[in-house]
Amino acid sequence: MHTTTKRRKAMDWLNFDPIPEVDRLFRFTCKHPTLHVHMTGSYGHMFVDISDLPASARHYLALMAASRHRCLSLMDHHRRKFLEKGGQQMWLLGIDWSYMKFRKLDYLNRMLCHRPWMIHWKNLAVLFARRTPDGGPAFFSVCSLHHAVGIMSMTHAMCTVICCIGLERRVDLTQDEIDFLNIDDLDYWEARMSAYFRKVPDRRPTEVEYLISELKKTEKGQTRPPAKMCAMTTETIESLISAPAATYSSNRKNYSPVLLLANIDENGEDIMEKEPPCNYPIYSHHRTFGYIDFRKRPEKDIPPFRVEEFGWDHVYNTMNEYTDTLTSRLDRMFDHIRTLTGNMPSGSSHASGDGEPPAAVNQNEIDTAAFREAIWNYTQGLYGVRVDDYDYSKINRVLDKGTKTFIKLAACYPHKLTTEFTRALPGFKDSEKIHVVMMVAMARFQASMFHYTRAVCNYNAMCLSKKGWRKPLD
């Protein structure tokens, strides 16, 4: 009887209204025609390309990925597409209603979105197919897993774009949606469910709260004190919810498949008991799990990712064998977005145009290569990707503190941005602002693919090492 009541209540989520914001997204990218072609081609190709993944499963994966950043617009869009492609309605009740392989993939979804440097080859070993060509209900084929990771990483990046340019739905919200958006806000839950949470007196602001307050000061033109950002340490995470967040072994010794069953953390504890009682459908477990500054990571045995040792060419060659068309599209998109603009007005200190030389070159125009390179390398540095031959001191000379704050929020906490923060880049034109946002989104996308593909190579090497052929990279 209890199960029937729960199922009837959850079925209300099937009666949603499609939100048109996603269709409006590519109208903004039209300000850069060539980029628009690459974006629409790459994003659309992920859902129509020939692959082992059924069409409905692709949209369900995107729904799982969008839920990590609580992007309601994308979630509504992929719910509708999932049903249009013949997906099972019961799956929309939550990830626990889907196949086992999607529940196991949820762990990888969390890592790709928030801490990709933690992806290990043993996380992939329990996902690959054993006997059936398509992987069956419990495993993925190599091709389908590559495709699934591409969809999830691209969706994470699209959440950044949608939230930054103000297309995220923040009106006509139900109470459950409001609870979902504030799942990690201790003050909100203290006021709403005081009986379930203890009050934390005089707690220090979390890193997200600090970044948002700094961004507000930038918009108001206030002078910011030279305060040091508080790191998202374990103590800070504990201030978000009543119980401490799940910990992850710095020795990386425990990679049991049970960790991939979503509702159990590495310590064998029930994640659901640590989260607020939110009734919104769960498409990805451990919803309070989030980004931690790479420099403050507890996993000190994980070194920075060196591009000189494993660059985009390695990623391309590894995945091109299985997803050649998709990989080629991504290669062209990454190459184009990094060279999108050639010049910018010196008065505004940012880029303009679509890579085409202006009719009359102004003597005050300067090259934007340093600006674009600083944005790209700073964003990827947030996810542990380092370029040895780049002078990172240039970032502080090229990007002011307000711009770096906006980039960090956009890349790591896009769900914390609202429409009022779209004015965080004063003096930027719409096309220029979109260019910056797209660079941030694609830089984090590529960083996720770096870490994932290196784990794939380590997995392949370990399989061969059993025959004495080679050793893993790590």
From Swiss-Prot:
Xref: Pfam families: PA26
Phenotypic consequence of gene deletion: RNAi-mediated knockdown results in decreased lifespan.
Single biological process term from Gene Ontology: cellular response to L-leucine
GO molecular function: L-leucine binding; oxidoreductase activity, acting on peroxide as acceptor
UniProt keyword terms in alphabetical order: Cytoplasm, Nucleus
Gene Ontology CC terms, in alphabetical order: cytoplasm; nucleus
Cited InterPro entries: AhpD-like (IPR029032), Sestrin (IPR006730)
Annotated compartments: Nucleus; Cytoplasm
Protein's job: May function as a negative feedback regulator of TOR function.
Family: Belongs to the sestrin family.
Name recorded for this polypeptide: Sestrin homolog
Native organism: Caenorhabditis elegans
